[in-house]
């Protein structure tokens, strides 16, 4: 188990190739593994952890807040995508998938997920959650790009500055612990009115649409107005525990981006599934363990084998128990006429 976990950590957490990981094991541990032996070890580990991965998937649908994102990922020469769904304590990574709504439905079924979905404005996320938060980092980047690409147009700079001011006011309200729920709603209404005024004042006329960058500017205004109408711009004000960006999911992708940029993506669909299982477990262990070390992982995983129940399956059972209705004996007695 120790060898398999060490090998998997080198490959999936440090983004080394299997050959590089074998070379390190040989150098530091005097352990020689053939390529086929390394492949068998990783396959065996993924098989052992499949039930834990399934528990992570089920818990994601029960989370109160989920941050999500997707990025390009090749399987052999086929263009696919990698997805990340992350909550406070758990992460599900999927590799070699399509970029469509079916992936979101698989992880966050409409009839199960009642939490807040934090995402960019990609089409599959629109009108998808009962409560949503669009990523302000993506929106601000678009405004920054306009401002820097067309410095000769002062309107773009002024628009960005006012948009940033409104966002910062929202962040200030988010952190204001003195506000009651009623106070937050009142402040939110004022902030939304201010935002509507901003969008109205900067609405492009036909002449401005024809100017350099005018189409992108008009598209950004339209996107902002739609997100406001969908009540997905300032959810973080009403729910201070929610971040205003999905940067947490983007950070989770750093190892994946490094592997992709060095052409170490998946060679087969089976390899993509193996990476999905092992990477999800490692990332979720990092979120739950005080310190992620080989010793702490081994202690946790050997405990799974000894007790027959993993940390994640135990957490899932607790969530299931918490969501069960109380038995009839614990329900309040009906009032007598």
Where are these regions (language model features)?
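Catalytic center-proximal scaffold of phosphoryl-transfer enzymes
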Residues: 1-337
